[in-house]
Amino acid sequence: MADELLHYGEDYHFIPATSAASGGGVSVLPDLYCHTVQIVNICLVGRPDDGAFVLIDAGMPGSADDIISAVEDRFGSGSRPQAIILTHGHFDHVGALIELIREWNVPVYAHKDELPYLTGKTRYPEPDASVEGGLLAKISPFFPNEPIQLGDHVHPLPEDGTVPHLPEFRWLHTPGHTPGHISLFRPHDAALIAGDAFVTVRQDSLYKVLTQQTEITGPPRYYTTDWTAARESVRKLAALFPSVAVTGHGAPVAGEELRDGLTKLARDFDRIAVLDYGKYVH
């Protein structure tokens, strides 16, 4: 597909939301860097002294310049990733994707079940503003929800669980938040890139998002449509006993804080994460 045919949904627009962490980054490991774009995280996987790296997710609408700046600050002027891997296709994870494709001309990979939402075929279910929670949940119907059109720039991840250009990682299907949601895990050091399978900030609360108050909890409530699958995905990740985790929202967590928090979430998922009411709660 020609670049000029790439397009966002008609409802795509800048979201004036931010957090205390916006614009900052954390070197979680020598080859794992977490950068916050307003209220969402991207990851850069690769050592700065090597120059080869992969970008995980693509931030908020209008954030391309911020992401390119973060990349060049870490890897040098003119650097570009070998590929972009998407944990899923919600607007806050693909918001700068088309600009980045045009800037870098690199392939994009996602789970096959996520491709309809990335090729203009299917829109996600409407956010549930009725869920219990804070202001962000209430305004979620105003978030972009029309599908992005990436055409042949996006490819399905290999069925064998390998991750292009990241041979030490494996991708895991962690549905619930979206049908084709994935997380990335590296067995030798138990490093986890969770996406939104679980997060470390209560994403429906504006105050907690603004302050980035750490709390290991389930996926963002207003966008999660399959709570049974979400529960099983958290249990799958907890069973890996990750040593460090970067999630789609909130600060990276590690060690005892991660182990205890994720174990508790897996054990008490319905009490901690699932809603008492909402149109996707059954």
Report each predicted region and the residues it spans:
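Short, charged, surface-exposed secondary-structure boundary motifs
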Residues: 117-121, 202-204, 279-280
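Binuclear metal-ion centers of metallo-dependent hydrolases, dominated by the metallo-beta-lactamase
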Residues: 250-282
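Residue-level marker for buried hydrophobic side chains located in beta-strands
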Residues: 54-56, 85, 108, 191-193, ...
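Short, structured coil segments at secondary-structure junctions
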Residues: 28, 103-104, 241
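Conserved beta-strand hairpin/beta-sheet module of binuclear metal-dependent hydrolase folds
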Residues: 18-75, 183-195, 200
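Metallo-beta-lactamase
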Residues: 3-16, 60-62, 114-175, 179-257, 269
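Active-site HxH/HxHxD metal-binding segment of metal-dependent hydrolases
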Residues: 64, 72-155, 264-265, 271-272
